[in-house]
């Protein structure tokens, strides 16, 4: 099976190796680049819990002054793995869904325990900080990275893709979906995806690509990528 992955290499290198070990052909089309955002200095010692909704949020955070034994809430297993790699020991992970993450926080962190810091990228799909504030929590959102659309792609890669279109393509965000649509249109690939299954996180992401004719569209949570191989 031919699989197209679209995340930055640091977010999908393990998946590339895994899929190749299963005998699949894997192509890599990084649609977005991740860049650190400089932010104001924050005294992290005053927070009693930390929330991460992506691995990138962990990578770009200056951890000086932060007690790594505090409760660390992660949106999914990959983010939790990244957090543990940076020394966090008291981690709690949802199943790749921000709404599930909110419920985990409500169940495992009492608002009387103190302040929460929510570390994220510039663009988010769910305003988790506002939702928690509406529940009475004291939450500070810290934006420490942004996503930038890649605009230059290797012509040799594009020509090879036209000759061997993927059976599956994984898209992880509305930003990525918009970038993929732009890539498809710019390279006049609109009519070539009718035998490709589109795998998206959430309906809002898949909606960005509805004008392209796909074989089927599947919605999934992070961590379910391998399971989806057996659904088509």
Give the residues covered by each predicted segment.
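Signature of uroporphyrinogen-III synthase
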Residues: 1-232
């Amino acid at each position: 099976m031919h699989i197209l992955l679209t995340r930055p290499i640091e977010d999908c290198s393990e998946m590339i190796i895994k899929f190749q070990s299963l005998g699949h052909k894997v192509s890599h089309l990084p649609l977005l680049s991740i860049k650190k955002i400089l932010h104001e200095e924050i005294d992290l010692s005053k927070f009693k819990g930390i929330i991460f909704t992506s691995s990138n949020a962990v990578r770009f955070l200056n951890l000086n002054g932060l007690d790594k034994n505090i409760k660390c809430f992660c949106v999914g297993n990959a983010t939790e793995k990244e957090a543990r790699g940076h020394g966090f020991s008291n981690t709690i992970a949802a199943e790749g869904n921000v709404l599930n993450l909110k419920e985990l926080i409500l169940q495992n962190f009492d608002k009387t325990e103190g302040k929460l810091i929510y570390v994220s990228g510039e663009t988010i799909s769910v305003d988790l900080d506002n939702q928690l504030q509406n529940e009475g929590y004291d939450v500070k959102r810290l934006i420490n990275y942004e996503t930038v659309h890649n605009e230059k792609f290797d012509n040799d890669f594009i020509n090879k893709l036209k000759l061997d279109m993927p059976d599956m393509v994984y898209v992880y965000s509305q930003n990525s979906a918009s970038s993929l649509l732009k890539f498809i249109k710019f390279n006049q690939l609109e009519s070539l995806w009718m035998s490709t299954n589109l795998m998206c996180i959430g309906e809002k992401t898949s909606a960005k690509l509805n004008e392209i004719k796909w074989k089927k569209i599947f919605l999934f949570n992070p961590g379910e990528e391998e399971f989806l191989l057996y659904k088509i």
